[in-house]
C-alpha cells in the first residue's frame, strides 16, 4: 500500500514541477506555454518512465503542436524534475495528447441526441 501511495505522491509532485516549469519557460515557441495543461501523469512501477498527458486550449493542430513543444523541450522539463524532486534518477518523460476531455464531451453529446430521439418517439406515439 505504501508503494502505491509513494507513486501517487511522486506523480502529483512531478505534475506540480512541470506546471511551474511551463509557467517559467523563457524559450521561443509557436504556442503559448502558459496554455498547456498537465492533465495527468502515469509513472511506471520502476519509476524510470513518466507518461505525461497534456492538453492545450486551442484547436487540434495547436494541441499537436503543444505535444511537439513538450517533446522538443524534454531536457528542460526533465532537468526541472531532477532539481526539484529527490529521486535516484529523474524519469524519462514521454508526452501524449490527452483526449479524455474531448471524449467525455463527445459522449455527452451522443447521450443528449439519444435522449432527444427517445423524447420524439414518445411524442409521436
UniProtKB/Swiss-Prot annotation:
Top-level taxon of origin: Bacteria
UniProt entry keywords in alphabetical sequence: Cytoplasm, Ribosome biogenesis
Gene Ontology molecular functions: ribosomal small subunit binding
Any single Gene Ontology cellular-component annotation: cytosol
Record GO biological process: maturation of SSU-rRNA
Subcellular location: Cytoplasm
Main location: cytoplasm
Function summary: One of several proteins that assist in the late maturation steps of the functional core of the 30S ribosomal subunit. Associates with free 30S ribosomal subunits (but not with 30S subunits that are part of 70S ribosomes or polysomes). Required for efficient processing of 16S rRNA. May interact with the 5'-terminal helix region of 16S rRNA.
Record-linked NCBIfam families: rbfA
Subunit composition and interactions: Monomer. Binds 30S ribosomal subunits, but not 50S ribosomal subunits or 70S ribosomes.
Family according to the record: Belongs to the RbfA family.
Protein name per the record: Ribosome-binding factor A
Amino acid at each position: 500500500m505504501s508503494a502505491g501511495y509513494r507513486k501517487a505522491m511522486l506523480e502529483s509532485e512531478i505534475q506540480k514541477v512541470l506546471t511551474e516549469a511551463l509557467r517559467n519557460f523563457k524559450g521561443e515557441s509557436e504556442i503559448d506555454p502558459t496554455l498547456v495543461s498537465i492533465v495527468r501523469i502515469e509513472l511506471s512501477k520502476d519509476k524510470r518512465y513518466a507518461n505525461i498527458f497534456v492538453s492545450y486550449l486551442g484547436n487540434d493542430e495547436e494541441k499537436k503542436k503543444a505535444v511537439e513543444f513538450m517533446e522538443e523541450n524534454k531536457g528542460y522539463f526533465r532537468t526541472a524534475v531532477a532539481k526539484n524532486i529527490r529521486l535516484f534518477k529523474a524519469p524519462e518523460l514521454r508526452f501524449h495528447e490527452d483526449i479524455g476531455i474531448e471524449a467525455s464531451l463527445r459522449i455527452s453529446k451522443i447521450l443528449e441526441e439519444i435522449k432527444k430521439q427517445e423524447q420524439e418517439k414518445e411524442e409521436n406515439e
